[in-house]
Amino acid sequence: MYCLQWLLPVLLIPKPLNPALWFNHSMFMGFYLLSFLLERKPCTICALVFLAALFLICYSCWGNCFLYHCHDSPLPDSAHDPNIVGT
């Protein structure tokens, strides 16, 4: 389970509030995971545990899935705040 110490923090990285950055974020996360899996070659149990956690987060539309944005889940209230200046 040593491999999970590098995989589990990936699930805690928040998605950006700006919808224009979602594609860039998902591409970065996808390439990070792909390069990690190719370079470190985690054990089968760690890979299955991580993929199960990723599937459950994305299937539940919890809002932190970096693969896609669930259409049923609304944007956070701070995304519509005009006082926040986007870059």
Swiss-Prot record:
- Per its UniProt record, what Pfam families does this chain match? BC10
Q: Does the keyword ATP-binding apply?
A: no
UniProt keyword annotation of Transmembrane helix present: yes
Q: Where in the cell is it found?
A: Cytoplasm; Nucleus; Membrane
Which UniProt keyword terms apply here? Cytoplasm, Membrane, Nucleus, Transmembrane, Transmembrane helix, Tumor suppressor
**InterPro entries per record:** BCALP (IPR009598)
Q: How does it sit in the membrane?
A: Multi-pass membrane protein
Function description = Acts as a tumor suppressor; induces growth arrest at G(1)/S checkpoint and apoptosis via RB1-dependent and p53/TP53- and NF-kappa-B-independent mechanisms. Modulates expression of genes involved in the regulation of proliferation, cell cycle and apoptosis.
| Protein name from the UniProt record | Apoptosis inducing factor BLCAP
State the species of origin.
Carassius auratus (Goldfish)
